Amino acid sequence: MTLLTETLSNIRPVDAGLMAQAQARLDNKTKPIGSLGRLEEFARRTVAISGSLDPSTAKKAIFTFAADHGVVEEGVSAFPKEVTVQMVFNFLKGGAGINVLANHVGADVLVVDMGIDHDFGDTPGLIDRKVARGTRNMAKGPAMTREEAVTALEAGIELACGCKADGVAMAGTGEMGIGNTTAASAIIAAFSGKTVADVTHRGTGINDAALAKKVTIIEQALAVNRPDPKDPIDVLAKVGGLEIAGIAGLVLGCAANRIPVVVDGFISTAGALIACELCPTVKEYIFAAHESVEIGHRFMLERIGAEPILDLHLRLGEGTGAALAMGLIEAGVKILKEMATFAEAGVEKGRDQ
């Protein structure tokens, strides 16, 4: 049995009984029933996912997966692919947006090389899971082989298993890869059947002419590769990315290990979508951090049945939205654990409570 097959077989529905118990506890806190809105949802879902009425949120980790994309040679991005490796060094030095926001919520940032076209050698702090030096140009053929896609998926699963061993209570996804909005748009187009134009946006800020070219290139990639929407690994291999595969694997591994996973924006949700297509139960373990301004993101969220926590017009990636959402999820859990009950506070209940 492969690691992927074993992981899929270990994913079970969350504990609905514990979720109900958590809500009963929340209803007995010193507040009108339901008055803390989605914070209560975050608390009861964390309980159901973790399998504990006293879930920890002490240790949080955000995985920023990085890889290059061969399709960049078609001119689909405003930035050259060299920016991928440059930003990885920025992450490692602590100077990026994700570093600032992760520090803000007390989360660790773990940077993973899934497929960057650069020889890092023994770079301190970088997790080496390189499958290839980037994908191939999907406009001309498959982005990767099926074997490469599975290897990248299993690398993400292994990282999730490491989270379990290290006592990580909440994981987050992030990414870096010039050209990866092209891959994400291709993935949602393949699964949804929507036109490429309906799911493709400006990514790093391309102009109208470049956007039109990006749409054409994605249409070409789909026509050349004909990814099978009934086979998620086929979609991933033909029009995906190595960092997207790593994210998908992390999400699967978190579900198998009962770890809440906070999924960032458009590219991260492409990975989560692959995971959910492989095993629909996975969606029970996902918190959607935010809704990106990338127009294809809404269709992804709808397909996995996830309601985003935030809408801040974010489009950076890296895991920035996941970091912010983690703070709110943790706040909900603290309400469950730290807020007084009516009896403890000596406060009378309302007539309907």
From Swiss-Prot:
Biological process GO terms, please? Answer: cobalamin biosynthetic process
Residue positions of the active site: E318 (proton acceptor)
List the keywords (alphabetical). Cobalamin biosynthesis, Glycosyltransferase, Transferase
User: Plastid among the record's keywords?
Assistant: no
User: Is Glycosyltransferase among the key words of this record?
Assistant: yes
Which catalysed reactions does the entry list for this protein?
A: 5,6-dimethylbenzimidazole + nicotinate beta-D-ribonucleotide = alpha-ribazole 5'-phosphate + nicotinate + H(+)
- Which Pfam families has this protein been placed in? DBI_PRT (PF02277)
Q: What class of enzyme is it?
A: transferase
Q: What molecular function does GO assign, one term?
A: nicotinate-nucleotide-dimethylbenzimidazole phosphoribosyltransferase activity
Q: What are its E.C. numbers? A: 2.4.2.21
Cited SUPFAM superfamilies: Nicotinate mononucleotide:5,6-dimethylbenzimidazole phosphoribosyltransferase (CobT) (SSF52733)
Superkingdom of source: Bacteria
**In which pathway is this protein known to take part?**
Nucleoside biosynthesis; alpha-ribazole biosynthesis; alpha-ribazole from 5,6-dimethylbenzimidazole: step 1/2
Family that this chain belongs to: Belongs to the CobT family.
Entry function: Catalyzes the synthesis of alpha-ribazole-5'-phosphate from nicotinate mononucleotide (NAMN) and 5,6-dimethylbenzimidazole (DMB).
Q: What is this protein called?
A: Nicotinate-nucleotide--dimethylbenzimidazole phosphoribosyltransferase
Native organism: Geobacter metallireducens (strain ATCC 53774 / DSM 7210 / GS-15)
- The gene behind this protein is cobT
